[in-house]
Amino acid sequence: AKEKRLKGSVFATMENVLAGYADPGVGAASSTSEIDVTEWLTGNNTIFVVATAHEQARLRPVLTVLIQQAIRAAYDAANERGGTLEQPCLVLLDEAGNIAPLRDLPGYASTARSHGITLVSIWQDLAQIKAIYGDRAQTVLNNHRAKLFGSGIADDPTLEEVSRLMGDEQRTDVNKSGDLHGPRRSISEHTSWRRLAPVDAIRRLRTGEGILLY
């Protein structure tokens, strides 16, 4: 019984992974390749990888493999030239958690820049990153040099993280008591730290506004 359940689990996983390749359009497109990776990396060229919202889950394995191959080709080309691409390469992953969640993204985030590859990934919130990468989620965030947070964030941990990254400011309060113009006056100072951008202020960002940390 245990062996049957294991086989069933393996077959179910394989079925999900290969479902995209069963698509006639995918099969026809993958039988030949018109993409010359060398030409793509040496010229002013762009590869667009797009899927409609209702097709993303089914085509995710196919698109993930395609993007992974393109990134690895860029790394290989950089290594052949001593570590850096002759012409900079931009990898822009919009809806990174939906269309093609790359297993090796934490590693790419930490090494791409040194190879002449600019990596941009766009997420809905931190919860989405953690759901995919678990303990490695913070690595994904930390290794993106620039971080742009837009308005409309509803996830409390994301709001708190933005507030923390903004840092604190020192504030000194002066209290005066007694006869302010006589000998019995008392003046005291109290120094405290507070967030530059409290969570409630970030939550109130208007459409078109954002916070860029670099």
Segments (PLM) and residue ranges:
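P-loop NTPase motor domains
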Residues: A1-I117, I132, S192, D200-Y214
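P-loop NTPase motor core of the ASCE superfamily
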Residues: N44, P106-S110, Q128-Y214
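Active-site-proximal beta-strand/loop segments in catalytic clefts of secreted hydrolases
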Residues: A51-T52, Q124-D125, S151-I153
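Acidic, glycine-rich active-site loops and adjacent beta-strand->loop/helix elements
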Residues: G97, D125-A127
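Structural recognition of the conserved hydrophobic beta-strand(s) that form the central parallel beta-sheet
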Residues: T118-W123
